């Protein structure tokens, strides 16, 4: 054994350098969060639970153009349009999304000309049965009402990049 290796083993240089490395990381802020109680901020482009939005006067935005249904690669969206109204517009009678099929690609949101269907900020929507993951129009509108403030803020932050 040579003198250098003997000196290193007696002086425990690897141990001391490892100790200082551990102490350096010990006093830095932790990257881990306490998840149920703390949540990381999400991006304005985050794609979570779907929602149907309303206009400020309370009327639903969806004009039953069926672009979202046509563009959906997973064929998770089903729409039935109602008859035309006196003013020439129409609304949906049925708007269903099968969340089991949905791949959260965001194509429906991009295709919508009136920003009616959006993917909101909610990512905690676990269910106990598959039937609960079949969203009808009432549930989608309720999601839109619940998350409207966050959705509007995210859309306004993302507007320069659209």
UniProtKB/Swiss-Prot annotation:
Its cofactor is [4Fe-4S] cluster. One of its GO terms (biological process) is aerobic respiration. It holds the Pfam family Fer4_7. GO terms for molecular function: 4 iron, 4 sulfur cluster binding; iron ion binding; NADH:ubiquinone reductase (non-electrogenic) activity; quinone binding. One of its GO terms (cellular component) is plasma membrane. Its main location: membrane. It catalyses: a quinone + NADH + 5 H(+)(in) = a quinol + NAD(+) + 4 H(+)(out). InterPro entries: 4Fe4S_Fe-S-bd (IPR017896), 4Fe4S_Fe_S_CS (IPR017900), NADH_quinone_OxRdtase_chainI (IPR010226). Keywords: 4Fe-4S, Cell inner membrane, Cell membrane, Iron, Iron-sulfur, Membrane, Metal-binding, NAD, Quinone, Repeat, Translocase, Ubiquinone. Its EC number is 7.1.1.-. [4Fe-4S] cluster 2 binds at residues 72, 102, 105, 108. It is found in: Cell inner membrane. Binds 2 [4Fe-4S] clusters per subunit. Residues 52-82, 93-122 form the 4Fe-4S ferredoxin-type domain. NDH-1 shuttles electrons from NADH, via FMN and iron-sulfur (Fe-S) centers, to quinones in the respiratory chain. The immediate electron acceptor for the enzyme in this species is believed to be ubiquinone. Couples the redox reaction to proton translocation (for every two electrons transferred, four hydrogen ions are translocated across the cytoplasmic membrane), and thus conserves the redox energy in a proton gradient. NCBIfam families: NuoI, PRK05888.1-4, PRK05888.1-5. Belongs to the complex I 23 kDa subunit family. This is NADH-quinone oxidoreductase subunit I 1. The gene is nuoI1.
